[in-house]
UniProtKB/Swiss-Prot annotation:
The active site is at D66. Its EC number is 3.6.-.-. Homodimer. One of its GO terms (biological process) is tail-anchored membrane protein insertion into ER membrane. GO terms for molecular function: ATP binding; ATP hydrolysis activity; metal ion binding. This is ATPase GET3. It comes from Rhodotorula glutinis. InterPro entries: Anion-transp_ATPase-like_dom, ATPase_ArsA/GET3, ATPase_ArsA/GET3_euk, P-loop_NTPase.
């Protein structure tokens, strides 16, 4: 049976096209982050965007940094911490990672000497360094894979803001640790030998310096609007609008570009609808949609997505959940499998 959907009427005064086509046209983009409040449709948006990018780019990687990891559910395909090809594509890959778990893997792969434990304690004394170093390991791994575009399906807003602060945290922390190399490296090597440990601190500091160089490069790329952008996803409610505004202000402080917003789950009752709840909900949504346009209408591409009567799962459904062609009043989206 074909699915039905109430869809958004065409509002007046779009200063910029209500479409993410601009992201496909910007060939220089390397990093695209998708984020927002929990439950607003970040994963569906990031998956759909990655599919559209795969049609115009040589290779695309979709990464989930949300510990909940919904990519596997969205594509109905199991993904892990290594990049795997998405079924039905030759150039789209996906992986699910947890920065803090990545750091734990790095610790467990080290030796068991007392010196190693001491250096871990020294490093972990820096606030946020555990997740940040996990982030660095992920970035180092991702950069080695040479994808032309990388889409991040991020965790809810608070986690995302912390994630985006990692490059700055790491740059400062690794700079301090690397500075210890010249001052205390020989002495720490001697102590390590006395303790019977086989750790060569010069090798450790070389690894830290190498990691710092990667993070410094990534940090510079994140602040370059030609290479990086962030796409907030929201629903037309007070809390979501408030959190989106807070997110955009934080992104501005981090000097991360943002010029697209996806407003998801919009409900527009048909003219002959007898559903009182639908009409009440529609009125509420219109209030906050209007506020969103007042805040962002002149400078942002605001993409309006309808509330669908079916959940978007599987590659076929994700391909139909387009963010490129603006929805028209009365348009029905059929997410059922092709016969």
């Amino acid at each position: 049976m074909a699915s039905t959907a109430f869809v958004c009427a065409e509002p007046e005064g779009d200063a910029l096209p209500p479409s993410l086509q601009n992201l496909l046209d910007q060939d220089s983009l390397k990093w695209i982050f998708v984020g927002g409040k929990g439950g607003v449709g970040k994963t569906t948006t990031s998956c759909s965007l990655a599919i559209q990018l795969a049609a115009v780019r040589e290779s695309v990687l979709l990464i989930s940094t949300d510990p909940a990891h919904n990519l596997s559910d969205a594509f109905s395909q199991k993904f892990g911490k290594e990049a795997s090809k998405v079924n039905g594509f030759t150039n789209l890959f996906a992986m699910e990672i947890d920065p803090s778990a990545s750091m734990q893997d790095m610790v467990e792969s080290g030796d068991d000497s007392g010196m190693n434990g001491m250096m871990q304690d020294l490093a972990f004394a820096i606030p946020g360094i555990d997740e940040a170093m996990g982030f660095a390991e992920v970035m180092k791994h991702v950069k080695s894979m040479q994808f032309s575009a990388i889409v991040f399906d991020t965790a809810p807003t608070g986690h995302t803001l912390r994630f985006l602060s990692f490059p700055s945290v790491l740059e400062k922390a690794l700079g301090k640790l690397s500075g210890l190399s010249g001052r205390f490296g020989p002495m720490l090597n001697q102590i390590g030998s006395m303790m019977g440990g086989g750790l060569n601190t010069s090798e450790m500091f070389e690894k830290l310096e190498s990691m710092r160089e990667v993070v410094t490069e990534v940090n510079a790329q994140f602040k370059n609007p030609d290479l990086t952008t962030f796409v907030p996803v929201m629903i037309s409610e007070f809390l979501s609008l408030y959190e989106t505004e807070r997110l955009i202000q934080e992104l501005t402080q981090y000097q991360i570009d943002v010029h697209d917003i996806v407003v998801n789950q919009l409900l527009y009752p048909e003219n002959d609808s007898q559903c009182k709840h639908c009409k009440v909900r529609w009125t509420q949504q219109q209030k906050y949609l209007k506020e969103a346009y007042e805040l962002y209408g002149e400078d942002f591409h605001i993409v309006r997505m309808p509330l669908l009567s079916q959940e978007v799962r599987g590659t076929d459904a994700l391909k139909k959940c387009l963010l490129i062609e603006p929805y028209k009043a009365g348009q029905v989206v059929d997410l059922s499998a092709s016969s």
